[in-house]
Amino acid sequence: MEMKQTIVCLTALAQETRLAVFRLLVEAGPDGLCAGDIGARLNVPAATLSFHLAQLANAGLLSARQQSR
C-alpha cells in the first residue's frame, strides 16, 4: 500500500464510529452485514451510518453490494 493510500485509510479509521463499523465488518467476514444490522448493533441512525459507510468506501476499506430481499 502506498503512503498516500495508507494515510487515507488511517484517517477514515481515526473516527470512532467508522472504526466500530470496520471492526464489525471484519468480524462478520466475507459475507458482511447489511446496513440495517450495523446500525442496530451500533445504535447509529441510518443517515449517520450512510455517511460513515461512504467515507469507508471512499477510502477503499469496504465495498457495497445491493441484495434483494
Residue ranges with predicted function:
Residues 4, 9-48, 69:
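N-terminal helix-turn-helix DNA-binding core of bacterial DNA-binding proteins
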Residues 58-68:
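Beta-hairpin "wing" of winged helix-turn-helix
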